[in-house]
Amino acid sequence: MKMPRKLTIANLPTNIEHLKRLSSELGNVDIYLKRDDQTGTEVSGNKIRKLEFAIAEAIDNGYDTLITCGAVQSNHARATAAAAAKIGLKCHLILRGSSEDVFEGN
C-alpha cells in the first residue's frame, strides 16, 4: 500500500516531555506528554496532521477551495480555515448550531 502525499505545514516532530513531578507523585509510572502545541501552527497537532494529507490531495486535483462542516465551535473547521489561509486556498465553512451566546454551568 502506497502512502498518500502530504504537504508539510506543521513543524514536526514535536517534543515528548517527561513529566517528572507527576510521575513521581503517582509512583511507579513514567508519564510523558506529546507537545503538539509546538507544531508552529494555529491549530492542534492531530488536526493539522490530517489536513496535511487532505490539502495535498486537493492541490493535486487542482482544487482552489476547501469546504468542510462542523458545529459553530468546531476545532476542525477552525483548523481547516487556518490551514487554507496559510497555503493560499479559499475556504468555506458550513456550521451548524447557534452562534448566539448560551451561558451554561457555573
Indicate where each model-derived feature is located.
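PLP-dependent amino-acid enzyme catalytic core
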Residues: M1-N106
